[in-house]
């Protein structure tokens, strides 16, 4: 007996898992994990499946993290939110704004669960989770022991954290603590946000602008399956960036604190005239080249072949090699996404 994963991944790719368990509390999550381990099955914890590509049928148990709840504590200088890992991220952004607690608005409409946000250190329009993260509560899967990691202990990087490294498959995230400062500072560095006046802008205006940009540029997974940005924006050494800017002076680029330079993957793909290109049922989105979509009953092989094609074209033109932001899941767990498309 197998169970379809199609409803549980936003790419809408039709693979199956041996078992799918919905965990609404910590105990259910732990017992499902321990049961699978006793049976010698691979096991993975999934939020809303908005950042994964299943490459084949999964030979084990998929646990859906549905731990809910939002608690708010107010201090003189901040609001402190303790949020269950299974809460929807965008609903949390709206909840905070509706209750006059700004600070999350740049991260509006990012798909997925709150518990997935620290794994990727989600970010958009100049703000990353690490800016507002206070702590992450986890449970050790083998022992059931609770751990609270401070933001510093999470070792956040660009789309990276300790949860993608040492703690991968060792812990489950059960809640995330956020600190929203009462000294709200708008971040207006990207896209349409640069047109807003920092002196008069409200958090609601930032939220509305972000939602407008995302809905006009990004496809709705309910219409065309996708996992948002398929590739990371590449971060390159300063000399490589200089070389590229000599050849392409209008290339968007964002100097980083450590001297490296972040490039815009979507722009690089667009310059290779790849918008609308299809392989099988997979396509490069026509509005936002960074997004690969399930345009017509795509298989995972179609998506991988298209990602390979995009990576090759960009690499040949710019000598910059893109890496997937989406996580690739094989028969018994995560596999190296770069190797899969190289």
UniProtKB/Swiss-Prot annotation:
Matches recorded under Gene3D superfamilies: 3.30.465.10, UDP-N-acetylenolpyruvoylglucosamine reductase, C-terminal domain (3.90.78.10), Uridine Diphospho-n-acetylenolpyruvylglucosamine Reductase, domain 2 (3.30.43.10)
Q: In which pathway does it act?
A: Cell wall biogenesis; peptidoglycan biosynthesis
- Using the UniProt record, give the first listed, main subcellular location: cytoplasm
Q: Which residues form the FAD-binding PCMH-type domain?
A: 13-183
Q: What are the UniProt keywords, alphabetically? A: Cell cycle, Cell division, Cell shape, Cell wall biogenesis/degradation, Cytoplasm, FAD, Flavoprotein, NADP, Oxidoreductase, Peptidoglycan synthesis
Q: Where in the cell is it found?
A: Cytoplasm
Q: Which GO terms describe its biological process?
A: cell division; cell wall organization; peptidoglycan biosynthetic process; regulation of cell shape
Q: Which PROSITE patterns match?
A: FAD_PCMH (PS51387)
Q: Which GO terms describe its cellular component?
A: cytosol
The free-text function statement in the UniProt record for this protein reads: Cell wall formation.
SUBUNIT field: Monomer.
Annotated protein name in UniProt: UDP-N-acetylenolpyruvoylglucosamine reductase
